[in-house]
A protein has these predicted regions:
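C-terminal functional module detector
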Residues: 1-240
Length: 240
């Protein structure tokens, strides 16, 4: 599908404009009335399999040791356990240690009294796109009134940043993207982010789930890329 058919650049072909196609007008330009303009980038799924075979990959799906991205080919690992040895964070046998002493992503971790679980997260950037900005852990739980809640924690920050202990947010790394060219900051951000983390709001009587979100520095949306490549202004009614 071309950028015109996706609705990301204006229709200029007289024959197409004279056809019975449905158009929408934005800033004096006519665009194809296409639902594609609201879609996100093609997503990808990744699994941690012992080997590149059908059986091994499906085994990884079954145990839910898997993750998804909105397009970038980054990789993410996530483990949970008790009394994990944080001094091993840079050891060569770190992953082997975690598989032996923790639960992998997608697994259930049973409570042990009032003991606070430890988490380990490791994200590695896609080398063909922007560096990493931060890694978050999102906690979901049911409060005392029976209402579902979610809380977001920044747990690892790029460029030496440390999460604020009160807001649980990383400082901004001031990465930029030039909407006119789609050039983005290449000298800010991290190639990888990894950390051990404990939930500061943990309650032993509370059932909860945790998942990881790795964020890149800002980049252009696909529709903005279409506009830049075709030397036209991006649509004003769409995110950039």
């Amino acid at each position: 599908s071309s950028a015109v058919l996706r609705g990301s650049i204006p229709v200029t072909d007289p024959a197409m404009l004279a056809s019975d196609q449905s158009f929408e007008e934005v800033d004096g330009n006519k665009y194809m009335n296409s639902s594609a303009i609201t879609w996100g980038a093609a997503g990808l799924a990744g699994v941690w399999a012992e080997e590149n075979t059908r059986n091994s990959i499906y085994d990884a799906f079954r145990r839910k040791e898997s993750f998804a991205t909105s397009g970038p080919r980054m990789t993410v690992r996530f483990f949970a356990g008790y009394d994990l040895d944080t001094s091993k964070i840079n050891d060569n046998d770190l992953v082997e240690y975690l598989y032996s002493n923790a639960k992998t992503m997608g697994a259930d971790l049973d409570g042990i009294g009032k003991q606070i679980p430890s988490f380990f997260v490791w994200a590695v950037r896609d080398t063909f796109t922007a560096p990493l900005q931060r890694v978050q852990i999102i906690k979901g739980y049911v409060d005392e009134n029976g209402n579902p809640q979610e809380q977001i924690f920044d747990v690892a920050c790029s460029d030496g940043g440390v999460p604020n202990p009160n807001t649980y947010r990383c400082p901004e790394n001031n990465a930029k993207v030039d909407i006119s060219t789609c050039e983005f900051s290449r000298d800010i951000g991290a190639a990888e982010l990894k950390t051990f983390w404990n939930d500061p709001t943990f309650k032993s009587e509370e059932r909860a789930f945790y998942y990881v979100r790795a964020l890149e520095n800002p980049t252009c949306r696909w529709s903005t890329w279409d506009a830049v490549r075709n030397n036209v202004e991006p649509r004003s009614d769409m995110p950039k």
